[in-house]
């Protein structure tokens, strides 16, 4: 079968879980690139995986058919997958030996004209879950100018966020914005300052993050891991955006911190026993030169790994 999406850092992910025995949770199954590679490389791993994209789920079920006795697939968002499994008594999370999350949009979603992720798309959607109520068309046409400015500044770090929001507000006052390529023309496709990425691309990224509540979803996932019954497991998270990477980095630092006393305390009074594990990647793992030749979209990917030992 034709594979529509190249998973980033596939070999590095496989290497992280290669010696584990037990149950792995793939919180972002996508088109099963990582899961199928892990199952092929390690016969001692079983996987529970989820995704909320029906197109991805349909494809993945066919792709992993040869591993059907070792993988179970669920329709769920990654932020509530662990609580879903626990609440429905589907499994005991203390048996989990690994968790994988790839917090990014697949190449197929980006390239699919109907999904509205691309600057050249005739649609204006950007929903990862087609059943979700909020889409990019609503954000662009109905959010206030100040809310648009906030999104562009917070989620894309655009210093000209005010001007971009004004362009959109002025345009939509006369005509509803209905396509991504129309929006890209309004914003402008010139590169932002000295960066090798266009202003429109960054603005689209910000809108996508807002539509899918991506930062909130990531924080909820990390909360669910922290508050779960998981005892011994490797947590591997791939991000594609500096804000997402910062969230993961800071949460891992928190998890590795034994003393949680305020910095002005002269001595520890908390028991110095609050760490739930250790960071396995001092610096994030990034794509090799060989991978970048095959998949330029892997350039912004960062993989961080934490080992829980409670």
From Swiss-Prot:
Its main location: cytoplasm. GO terms for molecular function: rRNA (cytosine-N4-)-methyltransferase activity. InterPro entries: RsmH, SAM-dep_MeTrfase_MraW_recog, SAM-dependent_MTases_sf. S-adenosyl-L-methionine binds at residues 32-34, 51, 84, 102, 109. Disulfide bonds: none annotated. Keywords: Cytoplasm, Methyltransferase, rRNA processing, S-adenosyl-L-methionine, Transferase. It catalyses: cytidine(1402) in 16S rRNA + S-adenosyl-L-methionine = N(4)-methylcytidine(1402) in 16S rRNA + S-adenosyl-L-homocysteine + H(+). Its EC number is 2.1.1.199. Signal peptide: none annotated. It is found in: Cytoplasm. GO terms for cellular component: cytoplasm. Gene3D superfamilies: Putative methyltransferase TM0872, insert domain, Vaccinia Virus protein VP39. GO terms for biological process: rRNA base methylation. NCBIfam families: 16S rRNA (cytosine(1402)-N(4))-methyltransferase RsmH (TIGR00006). Specifically methylates the N4 position of cytidine in position 1402 (C1402) of 16S rRNA. Belongs to the methyltransferase superfamily. RsmH family. This is Ribosomal RNA small subunit methyltransferase H. It comes from Campylobacter hominis (strain ATCC BAA-381 / DSM 21671 / CCUG 45161 / LMG 19568 / NCTC 13146 / CH001A). The gene is rsmH.
């Amino acid at each position: 079968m034709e594979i529509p999406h190249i998973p980033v850092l596939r070999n590095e992910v496989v290497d992280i879980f290669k010696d584990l025995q037990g149950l792995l949770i793939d919180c972002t199954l996508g088109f099963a690139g990582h899961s199928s590679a892990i199952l092929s490389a390690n016969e001692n791993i079983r996987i529970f995986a989820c995704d909320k994209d029906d197109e991805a789920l349909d494809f993945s079920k066919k792709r992993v058919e040869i591993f059907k006795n070792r993988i179970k697939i669920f329709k769920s968002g990654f932020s509530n997958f662990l609580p879903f499994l626990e609440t429905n008594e589907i499994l005991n999370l203390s048996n989990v030996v690994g968790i994988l999350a790839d917090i990014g949009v697949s190449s197929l979603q980006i390239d699919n004209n109907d999904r509205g992720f691309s600057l050249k798309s005739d649609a204006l959607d950007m929903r990862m879950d087609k059943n979700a109520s909020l889409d990019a068309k609503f954000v662009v046409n109905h959010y206030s100018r100040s809310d648009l400015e906030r999104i562009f500044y917070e989620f894309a770090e655009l210093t000209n966020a005010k001007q971009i929001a004004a362009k959109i507000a002025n345009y939509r006052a006369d005509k509803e914005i209905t396509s991504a390529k129309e929006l890209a023309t309004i914003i402008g496709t010139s590169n932002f300052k000295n960066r090798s990425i266009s202003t429109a691309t960054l603005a689209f990224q910000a809108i996508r993050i807002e539509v899918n509540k991506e930062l909130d979803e990531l924080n909820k996932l990390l909360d669910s891991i922290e508050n779960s019954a998981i005892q011994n497991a490797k947590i591997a998270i791939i991000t594609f955006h500096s804000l997402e990477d910062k969230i993961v980095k800071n949460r891992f630092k928190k998890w590795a911190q034994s003393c949680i006393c305020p910095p002005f305390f002269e001595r520890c009074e908390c028991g110095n026993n609050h760490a739930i594990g250790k960071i396995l990647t001092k610096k994030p793992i990034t794509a090799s030169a060989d991978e970048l030749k095959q998949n330029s979209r892997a350039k912004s990917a960062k993989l961080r790994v934490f080992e829980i030992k409670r």
